[in-house]
Amino acid sequence: MMVGVVFGLHRLFFCLYVYFYAYIIYNKSVKGSEFMNQLEQIVEISAAGNGVLRTSEVISKGISKTTLAKFVEKYNYERISHGIYCSPDVWKDGLYLLQLRCPKTIFSHDTALFLLDMTDQEPLQYTVTVKSGYNATHLREDGVKVFSIKKDFFELGISKAKTPFGNEVFIYNPERTVCDMIRSRSQIEIQIFQDAMKQYIRRKDKNLHLLMEYAKKLRVNHMLSKYLEVLL
C-alpha cells in the first residue's frame, strides 16, 4: 500500500517537473520569437526614418525601452540626444537631427534660402527662428544662429522642404523668407541678400500678392516696395 502511494507521488512530481520544464521552454521560445519580431520592427522603423530612431516612436509600436536599449547597443547606434539615436551606417543629416532635437524651431533666413534653392551658398551655420521667450541658449552653444519673433507671427508662412539627404523639415516659404531677409538685412551678407531677392523674382511660383501681405504684417512693406521697383 505504502509503496503504491510513494510510486504515485513520485509519478505526480515527475509529471509536474515535465510540465513546468515544458512550460519554461515554451515561454522562452515564445519570448525569443517576440524579441526577434520586435528587433525586426525596430529595423523597419529605422529604415523608414533614414537611420534615425526616436524612443517615442518605438514605444508607440508596443516595443519596450529594454528591447530598444539592446538593439541600440547591439548595432552601435549613436545617441544624438535624449530619445534620439542614429545608425552608424548613414550620414548624419544635421538639419533633420537639429529639428528632431528642437521641434519648436523653424529653419529661416539663409538656411531657408538654401533649402528653397534661392542661393548657391551652403550656410556656414544653421539659422532658425523661435517664438519670443524661447530659451535658445543650447542652440547658440551649438553654433546655431537664432532669431526670435512674436508668437503672432511665428507660424506665418510655415512650409516644408527636403534636406539634401531627403528628410523633411519645417522652413518658411519664399515670401516669408524674403520678408525675414529684409527685416534682418543688417545681419545678412549684402551679396546673399541681393542674390536672394533676384532669385525670388525669377521664381515661377512666386506670389507677389502674398509677399506684400506678409510684408505689411511684418512692417517691411515700404522697404520691400523699394527693392521691387528696382528688380521688376
Language model features with spans:
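Residues in the helix-turn-helix
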Residues: 67
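Short, positively charged and aromatic/hydrophobic N-terminal segments
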Residues: 13, 17-28, 32
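Basic amphipathic alpha-helical segments that dock to polyanions
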Residues: 70-75
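Targeting/processing segments of secretory and organellar proteins
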Residues: 3-5, 10
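A detector for short, charged/polar N-terminal pre-domain segments
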Residues: 30-35, 39-48
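Nucleic-acid-binding surface
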Residues: 38-41, 51-57, 80, 84-232
